Design a protein with these regions (language model features):
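Short, surface-exposed binding/anchoring microloops in extracellular/periplasmic proteins
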Residues: 58-61, 68-93, 97
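Extracellular/periplasmic catalytic domains that process cell-envelope and extracellular macromolecules
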Residues: 68-71, 91, 99, 118-119, ...
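Ligand-binding loop in jelly-roll beta-barrel domains
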Residues: 121, 130-158
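Conserved hydrophobic/aromatic beta-strand scaffold that supports enzyme active sites
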Residues: 76-78, 97, 117, 125-127, ...
Length: 171
C-alpha cells in the first residue's frame, strides 16, 4: 500500500469516527407531556414500615405491606388530560398509586407486550411500581380525564424523569 492510500484510509477513518461521535452524541428528545400536572401536597415522610393483615367482607385473606428505608418525599399530584393528551414517556424513582377520577386513562408501560396499554375508567386505580418502569398515560377518550397520584420518592430525587419511548413498543 502506498503512502497516499494509507493517508486516504487514515483520513477516512478519522472522518468516520468524527461523524460517529457527532451522530451518537446528539441529544435525543423525550416525548413531552401535554397533560397538565399540579402538585397539591408535598411533604417529607419518615421511614415507614406497615404490615396489615385482615379479611375481605367475603372472608378472603387480605394483606398490605408498605416499607421505606429512608426519608421519602411524598406527593399528591393532580393530572388533567384533554382528549388526546398524554404524560409523555417517563419514569419515577419510587412507587405511585394512581386514581382515575373522571374519564378514562390508558397506561402504556414498557413491561407490556408492545406497550399496548391497559385502560382504566373513572373510579378505578392502578399501581406504578417506579424504578425502571417506563410508562405513558394517555387520554384516548373523547372527554376530559383527571387522575390523582400519591407518590413516594426517595428524598431529593426528581419526582418525574422524562424518557424516550421504549424500543420494544413497536416491534
Amino acid at each position: 500500500m502506498n503512502k497516499l492510500s494509507r493517508r486516504c484510509i487514515a483520513v477516512g477513518a478519522a472522518l468516520t469516527a468524527t461523524i460517529g461521535v457527532v451522530v451518537s452524541s446528539s441529544p435525543v428528545q423525550a416525548t413531552p407531556s401535554t397533560a397538565t400536572s399540579k402538585v397539591l401536597v408535598q411533604a417529607s415522610v419518615r421511614p415507614t414500615r406497615v404490615f396489615t393483615v385482615n379479611k375481605t367482607v367475603t372472608g378472603q385473606p387480605w394483606a398490605a405491606l408498605l416499607a421505606t428505608y429512608g426519608v421519602s418525599d411524598g406527593y399528591v399530584v393532580e393530572n388533567d388530560f384533554q382528549p388526546g393528551q398524554s404524560t409523555g414517556w417517563h419514569s419515577h424513582p419510587g412507587p405511585s398509586l394512581i386514581f382515575v377520577v373522571t374519564g378514562s386513562i390508558t397506561n402504556h408501560a414498557s413491561d407490556q407486550w408492545r406497550c399496548k396499554g391497559v385502560t382504566y375508567a373513572a373510579g378505578s386505580a392502578f399501581l406504578d411500581a417506579g424504578g425502571t418502569d417506563v410508562h405513558e398515560l394517555v387520554n384516548a377518550g373523547t372527554t376530559p380525564a383527571e387522575t390523582i397520584a400519591v407518590q413516594f420518592i426517595p428524598q431529593g430525587q426528581p419526582r418525574r424523569i422524562d424518557k424516550l419511548e421504549p424500543s420494544n413498543c413497536h416491534v
